[in-house]
């Protein structure tokens, strides 16, 4: 899709670059698949900030997206491709042969009128969902499960994908965009193709207010704070005085924070190894 630059009619418009998507639905979402979404402002039930840089933003409705794709053997037709404010990828509204409608993450190239299917015998084409044991080696996949039947957890954001490298017994070996190689059970499901809206990283918001519309608050450097607020704060001139740490003193560079030792054995190649 083309990248459109705005005329500099104001300072806020000067640096705006947006992606034009002429194929997206211009109306409201399908009402039965929409839920209310309450904003937390990054606070927990005690009112304490648990996630920094979150707050404000435009009201949004949550679209109920089907990540399990468990309607096997029932073909579906894509009614339309829609914008979803809750994610970077676009979503597709499917109408199944039995009349049910569901949203899915739209893969690259999927358009209204296309047919998609789920199940062991689904043909190998973008948008179809089937187990990893039935995928051709070298396939580009997205919406990959980590646990059988739990629903997709990997490669769900705009332009992402994983590659199926091979199979070893009851496990498939995949390579993620980060460079990590890991084993996933062959009965876990995935969808053929890569996620839509791959130009998302080329856009430029142009002004701070565009981030505020999205519920993102400013990020202040620790060096610009006082010593009471951050370990990097204070000092004469620009001086950290210590190695980079978080506001709570945890090392910020090179320190591994992974605690799920149970699944570490599934990782063949770490994403940090270059």
Curated annotation (Swiss-Prot):
List the molecular function annotations (GO) for this entry: rRNA binding; structural constituent of ribosome; transferase activity
Q: Does the keyword RNA-binding apply?
A: yes
Q: What segment(s) does the record annotate as region Disordered?
A: 222-256
Q: Which GO terms describe its cellular component?
A: large ribosomal subunit
According to the record, the signal peptide region is: none
Keywords for this protein: Ribonucleoprotein, Ribosomal protein, RNA-binding, rRNA-binding
Which InterPro entries does the protein's record reference?
NA-bd_OB-fold, Rib_uL2_dom2, Ribosomal_uL2, Ribosomal_uL2_bac/org-type, Ribosomal_uL2_C, Ribosomal_uL2_dom3, Ribosomal_uL2_RNA-bd_dom, Translation_prot_SH3-like_sf
Name a single GO biological process. Answer: cytoplasmic translation
Q: Does the entry feature the keyword RNA-binding, yes or no?
A: yes
Taking the record's annotation, the residue ranges forming a coiled coil are none
Q: Where is the composition biased (Basic and acidic residues)?
A: 229-239
According to its UniProt entry, what is the function of this protein? One of the primary rRNA binding proteins. Required for association of the 30S and 50S subunits to form the 70S ribosome, for tRNA binding and peptide bond formation. It has been suggested to have peptidyltransferase activity; this is somewhat controversial. Makes several contacts with the 16S rRNA in the 70S ribosome.
Q: How does it assemble?
A: Part of the 50S ribosomal subunit. Forms a bridge to the 30S subunit in the 70S ribosome.
| Protein family | Belongs to the universal ribosomal protein uL2 family.
Name by which UniProt lists this protein: Large ribosomal subunit protein uL2
Annotated organism of origin: Acinetobacter baylyi (strain ATCC 33305 / BD413 / ADP1)
